[in-house]
Amino acid sequence: MASPSAEPPAFARAVAGLRAPAPRPEILLEEIAAPQRLAPYAFALSATVLRSGDEVAGGRLILLHDPAGHEAWHGDIRLVTLVTAELEADLADDPLLPEVAWTWLTDGLAQHAAAYTAIGGTITQTTSTRFGELAGPPPTADLEVRASWTPTADDATAHLLGWCAMLASTAGLPPPGVALLGQNQRANTP
């Protein structure tokens, strides 16, 4: 990886956009070591999503930059993500879950006017049932979103915001400013 002083301006602008603060207090962002072999320049963030103090989802967002461009990317900057979340078992059985989970990403990007091209990815849903020495806890279900896309502008702030919106949807967080019924309400009993 090249030294920071030698970073191309397009990469530096994209990194600056990804260093914007998280739009929600439930989403904790942290810079992590980026993969070194995927592109000449790379930057990475990890995210932890908390609900009532418990981790309910997590992910990584990796920015790749190849000044020479990359034919498959349709550009010289690429964003790559992996997001995972534990689900309620009944949600994991929903046949529409993959399509809905994909729209969490595309809607999040659209909501923040994050223009892109060459988007692609996979949605994986798994259910685990424990047996033998591991028996006891109820079955668990997990969702995994792997995706990548090419921003059409160097400023990645809108892409960060769209990705955070997808994280919030994946984690089942209500929209900002909306409380779920039964939460944050005072009892009306004397």
Regions of interest found by a model, annotated:
Residues 1-35:
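Short, extreme N-terminal leader segments that mark the start of a protein/domain
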Residues 24, 33, 52, 144-146, ...:
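Interaction-mediating elements
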Residues 44-84:
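A glycine-rich, hydrophobic loop/mini-helix early in the fold
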Residues 60-65, 126-136, 140-146:
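Aromatic/basic-lined ligand-recognition segments
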Residues 74-89, 139-148:
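Glycine-rich, often proline-containing surface loops adjacent to acidic residues and nearby aromatics
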Residues 95-133:
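Short, internal acidic amphipathic alpha-helical interface segments
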Residues 119-135, 177-190:
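Short, highly charged C-terminal tails/helix-capping segments
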Residues 146-190:
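Mixed-charge, glycine-accented linear interaction segment located at domain edges/termini
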